[in-house]
Amino acid sequence: MTIFQFPQDFMWGTATAAYQIEGAYQEDGRGLSIWDTFAHTPGKVFNGDNGNVACDSYHRYEEDIRLMKELGIRTYRFSVSWPRIFPNGDGEVNQEGLDYYHRVVDLLNDNGIEPFCTLYHWDLPQALQDAGGWGNRRTIQAFVQFAETMFREFHGKIQHWLTFNEPWCIAFLSNMLGVHAPGLTNLQTAIDVGHHLLVAHGLSVRRFRELGTSGQIGIAPNVSWAVPYSTSEEDKAACARTISLHSDWFLQPIYQGSYPQFLVDWFAEQGATVPIQDGDMDIIGEPIDMIGINYYSMSVNRFNPEAGFLQSEEINMGLPVTDIGWPVESRGLYEVLHYLQKYGNIDIYITENGACINDEVVNGKVQDDRRISYMQQHLVQVHRTIHDGLHVKGYMAWSLLDNFEWAEGYNMRFGMIHVDFRTQVRTPKESYYWYRNVVSNNWLETRR
C-alpha cells in the first residue's frame, strides 16, 4: 500500500458546463446559443439529442449543491451561459439570468464551496454567430462587455475566473473539423476564431485588472500529449504539430508574444494566415495568474498526408480505452505538465480530468470501478508533478453529473453521479464515494 499525501491547501473539486447541465433553454429571458441551433439540426448530435432540459440543473441546483457538499469538495467549476446574461450577445442585460447565477454562487459560498467560474464554455449567442461569430472582430467587444458585467456583478463572490474553456475546440474542432457548433469546415475561419478569442481573452484580463476585481484569472486549454510511432523525422514532426496546436498555439502568444512559427508556416502553406492587427499581441500578452489544464488522454501518432490538416494520424497501440474510445494513459498528464514549464513555474489547476464509463444503475448502485481506476492513475501523476516542484494547485474531476456530452448527446457518461434523464433522479456512483474519501483524507491510497 502506498499513500500519496497532497498539500494542505490543495483544492479538490469537480466541474460542469452550463449547456451540458442547465436546461431551461427558453426560460427567464435566455436567448438561443449556437449549441441550441446545432443540436436542433438533424444529424449533428447523436440520436437527435439536445440540451433543452439536460440535467435540469437550472431548477435543481440546490439538490446538486447539496450533493457537492456531501462530496466534501472545496471548489466547483461551472460556466456561465452567455445568452442567459445577454440574450442577443450584447446590448441589454437580462437581470433574471444574473439573478440565477447569484443564487448559485451565494449557495456555493454559503456551503463553503469556492465558485470557480468559466466565462465561455462554447455557448456563443446565436445572434452573434448570425453576424459571423468569432470570425468577426465585433464578437471580441461583445465578449468583453459580457466579461465586465460578470466581474462587476460577482466581485468579492468569485475568486477564480477562466476566460475560455478549450480554445482548440472553439477554433478548430468547431470551425475546421465541423464536429461541434457552429459546424464549419474552413481552416482560415478556424485561425481567425482562435486569434479573435485570444484578443478577447487579453482585453478581458486587462479589464479585470482595471476594475480591481478580486481573485485570479486565467484560461483553460485542452492539452494533448503525443509520442511518435517511429523515430522518423516525419513522425516526430506530426507529434509536435499535435501537441503544439493544442497547447502552444494558445499559450505561447500569452506568455511569449508570438505564435509557434513552425505552425504559422505550416498553415501558410495551406493558404491560411493569422489576422494580427496592430496592438493585438500586446493585448493577448496581458499577464495572467494561472492556467487551467483539461487532460483526458495521450496518443501515438505518425505522419500521414491523408490525415487531415495536421497530417498526423493517431495509431491504436492496444491500450485500454474508455467507452468514448480514448486511450487510458496517465503518463501523458505528467509529461504535458512538465512540457508547459517552458512558460515558467506557473500556478496550474487541473480543471478537467475524467473518464467516460457507461455503467448503469443495478440494484440502486453504479459500480464504476474503471472510472475509479482512471482517476486514481491520474491523481498519482498529479502527485508526482507536485513532488517535482510544479505548482499544481487543484484537481477538478469531470464531471459531477452525467450530462449532455456535446455531439455524443446522452450516449456518453462522464459523471460521478448517474442521472436518469427521463426522471432526473440522481444516483451517486461508487466513484463519488471513492472520491469523497480522497477529498476527506487529502491523500490517495494505492495498492502496489
UniProtKB/Swiss-Prot annotation:
Task: Give the signal peptide as a residue range, or say none if absent.
Answer: none
Q: Which UniProt keywords apply?
A: Carbohydrate metabolism, Cellulose degradation, Glycosidase, Hydrolase, Polysaccharide degradation
**What is the enzyme's class at the highest EC level?**
hydrolase
Question: A Pfam family name for this chain?
Answer: Glyco_hydro_1
Cited InterPro entries: Glyco_hydro_1 (IPR001360), Glyco_hydro_1_AS (IPR018120), Glyco_hydro_1_beta-glucosidase (IPR017736), Glyco_hydro_1_N_CS (IPR033132), Glycoside_hydrolase_SF (IPR017853)
The answer on whether this UniProt entry bears the keyword Ligase reads no
Q: What is an example of a GO molecular function annotated in this UniProt entry?
A: beta-glucosidase activity
Q: Where's the active site on this chain?
A: 166 (proton donor), 352 (nucleophile)
Q: Which is a Gene Ontology cellular component entry for this protein?
A: cytosol
Q: Origin, by domain of life?
A: Bacteria
Known function: BglA is intracellular and cleaves cellobiose probably through inorganic phosphate mediated hydrolysis.
Give the protein name, as stated in the record: Beta-glucosidase A
Task: Tell me what organism the protein belongs to.
Answer: Paenibacillus polymyxa (Bacillus polymyxa)
